[in-house]
Amino acid sequence: MKKVYILLPLLFLIYWSCEDTKEEEPIYTFVKTFGANGGDIGRSVQQTADGGYIITGKAGCGVDGGGVWLLKTNSQGIEEWSNLLTNAYGCNNGDGEGRWIQQTTDGGYVIVGTAFPDFYDEYHDYPRTILLIKTDSQGQVEWKQNFGGIDYGLFDDSEGRFVQQTDDGGFILTGYTYSTKNHTNDVWLIKTDANGNEEWNRTLGDSIYFQWNAGGDEEPMPYALNDRGSSVQQTSDGGYIIGGYSTGWCFDSDWRITCKSNVLLIKTDSRGDREWLKSFGESKAGEFHRGHSVQITPDGGYIIAGERAIGNEASNFWLIKTDINGNQIWDKTYGNGGER
């Protein structure tokens, strides 16, 4: 049986210094589990203005069905209330999943995730859509919006990964969508007003066909990149910075599947038009680099958290620091024996 776990006070803790340090065991303030249906998943947590915590994710299939789950606790992790925000199709695919949550300026919450249609199947023959939900302070739904799907193009499969409230009271969200132009996934950036109505959307990235083989040399073999947005922040100039990654699949001369993956950092203006794109990680088949979160640093640059792996080795935590123009200043790898 799967349950949602919340471990506080820290989700991730990184130590680095010029001196050797002894690894210390974490001290937990509390550990709580929520859910009893099986298949319950916690995806995002944020501390709220009252010192408690708000969690979103996916509820498994139980008496009330499944779907996007919202749960509020006090400062000690004791549940205050929980709401199932989507349950249109009962237990069929769980109906949806929350991927990121933020408390809004009015004390309510905004959740972005993915909605599954009632006819969705494991082969993705029918499209998922990005789901945006706004609730009041008690988790009662005020409105829902969907982006993507057949209205945007047949078999347009989309997934929402991150949302942030913008300075004008609206929302900026990112994830990915299937591009009918390139026949690959593109980073999708969507701007809405305060009621979730779309103001504009942009597909970003470099989803083009390449020539590559398993040894890293150019060969006349098919190759395509799939770009995905993982995180977005509004910048001081009114534009946006998006962190994510680009993955690719190809076949070598013996028709063996090979692949690669790079971290992406994309800067746009206030209308979502791309100003620049930076890629991090060596562009060789068999190397994996993924960006999962980006933050703006006090010096105006950016810090990216992600993962990297080469060949068959396990992935390691990867931290990249850039200047305001996305040029790498330094990077650090943690795991499998410490900092490198």
Please provide the spans of the model-predicted regions:
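A sequence-level/structural motif corresponding to short, flexible coil/turn segments enriched
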Residues: C18-R340
